[in-house]
Every structure is written in structure tokens, then in C-alpha cells.
């Protein structure tokens, strides 16, 4: 294990002790954010991550969210949020407006993920993207034994539910980034709440992955 991986594990553990309510991938994201950063959270939901980062990292945080009920929840928390889809929300920001732009568990629902990530890297110094991993061994076994499309770990949604998710694996996303020329600045692989090493079998073992991308 490298020193950076050990440091990341320690930070995630410390954050988990203070915020048991955040999803494991959001705790991993929080461990990457430095105090005082300017942060944009795409598809920020009800603002749990932004509120946590404002309280514990003193970030200048903004969110973009489509659902009106989630936008209202953010407003009640005092979070700066705009309602709209990601393409409309991103185009209004000048280049270099943020230190980190976050996209958590949303990639499977995007019609044009390449465009969104390019926009993230335009307005931010880095993009932090978390994905559910349909390549996890339980998903593979479920497909083999039942003949049905499996639900991704942490994403309990039937294949015909709206909005519809496009299944992807860690390997799929890594190859996608290579094709699009997105430079990787590191990744965190999670098995539930626990981080696992970057090994040949990570696509089998990880339930979620957090990727850091640079322009």
C-alpha cells in the first residue's frame, strides 16, 4: 500500500467517525477536498455532501439539482443551489470557477457523459466522479444464476425504472476515460464502506469507485 493510499484510508475513517449519515462514496469524496476549496456538486440531491463540506471543510459550495423537492431541501439547509439540468447549469460558469467539480453516482443516467465531464474539467481544476460498479462479483453471479439484469451495489433500481441507468463497470469507465483523453489523477475503490487496494481484481471486488480526473 502506498503512503497516499494509507493517508486516504485514514482520512476516510476520520470522516466516517464524524458523519455516519453520508454514503461511503461521499465520505471518500470529502476526504479529497481541502479546506476553503470552491466546490460544485452536480446532481447534489438534498445537499448532504455540500452541507458536510461547508461545516467541516469550510468550502465555498454550490450545487445543481433537477428535482424541485431536493432544491427546496438544499435551500432549507442554506446551500446555494440552482435548479436545472447539468448541461444548462454548467454552461453558465466561466472556465476555472471551481477547484473541484463533483459528480456522484450520476454517470449511468447521462445521455452524453463525455460532454459533461469535459464541462466539469472546463469549469474546475479537477473532476471527482463516483460510479456504481456492475462488474462486482455479486452482480456477475446474479446475472449467471437468474438471467436477469442485476442491480448495482448501492443503486437498488430495476432496469425499467425511470430514469433508466446504463450499467457500467470500473473497466468500462477507465477505458472510456482513455478514449476521451481524460487524465487520471488517482482513484479510490470501495467495497461497501471499506477501501480496497488498486489490484487486478478491483473490478470484481469493488462496489463503488471514486475517480479523480484532470484536464
Located regions from the model:
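Class I SAM-dependent methyltransferase Rossmann-like catalytic core
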Residues: 7-21
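Conserved alpha-helix/loop element of class I SAM-dependent methyltransferases that forms part
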Residues: 20-36
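Class I SAM-dependent methyltransferase "Motif I" SAM/SAH-binding loop
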Residues: 43-45
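Glycine-rich SAM-binding Motif I of class I
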Residues: 47, 51
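Class I SAM-dependent methyltransferase SAM/SAH-binding core
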Residues: 52-89
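Short conserved loop adjoining the S-adenosyl-L-methionine
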Residues: 89-95
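A short SAM/SAH-binding and catalytic strip from SAM-dependent methyltransferases
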Residues: 100-111
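S-adenosyl-L-methionine-dependent methyltransferase catalytic module, highlighting the catalytic core
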Residues: 114-119, 126-215
Amino acid at each position: 500500500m502506498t503512503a497516499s493510499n494509507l493517508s486516504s484510508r485514514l482520512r476516510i475513517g476520520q470522516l466516517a467517525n464524524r458523519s455516519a449519515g453520508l454514503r461511503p462514496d461521499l465520505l471518500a469524496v470529502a476526504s479529497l477536498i481541502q479546506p476553503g476549496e470552491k466546490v460544485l456538486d452536480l446532481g447534489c440531491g438534498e445537499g448532504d455532501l455540500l452541507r458536510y463540506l461547508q461545516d467541516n471543510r469550510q468550502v465555498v459550495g454550490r450545487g445543481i439539482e433537477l428535482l424541485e423537492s431536493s432544491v427546496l431541501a438544499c435551500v432549507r439547509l442554506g446551500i446555494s443551489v440552482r435548479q436545472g439540468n447539468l448541461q444548462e447549469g454548467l454552461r453558465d460558469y466561466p472556465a476555472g470557477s471551481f477547484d473541484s467539480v463533483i459528480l456522484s453516482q450520476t454517470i449511468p443516467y447521462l445521455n452524453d457523459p463525455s460532454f459533461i465531464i469535459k464541462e466539469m474539467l472546463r469549469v474546475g481544476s479537477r473532476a471527482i466522479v463516483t460510479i456504481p460498479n456492475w462488474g462486482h462479483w455479486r452482480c456477475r453471479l446474479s446475472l449467471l444464476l437468474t438471467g436477469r439484469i442485476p442491480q448495482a451495489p448501492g443503486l437498488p433500481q430495476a432496469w425499467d425504472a425511470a430514469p433508466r441507468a446504463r450499467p457500467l463497470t470500473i473497466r468500462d469507465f477507465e477505458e472510456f476515460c482513455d478514449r476521451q483523453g481524460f487524465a487520471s489523477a488517482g482513484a479510490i475503490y470501495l467495497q461497501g464502506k471499506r477501501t480496497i487496494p488498486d489490484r487486478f481484481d478491483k473490478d470484481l471486488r469493488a462496489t463503488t469507485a471514486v475517480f479523480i480526473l484532470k484536464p
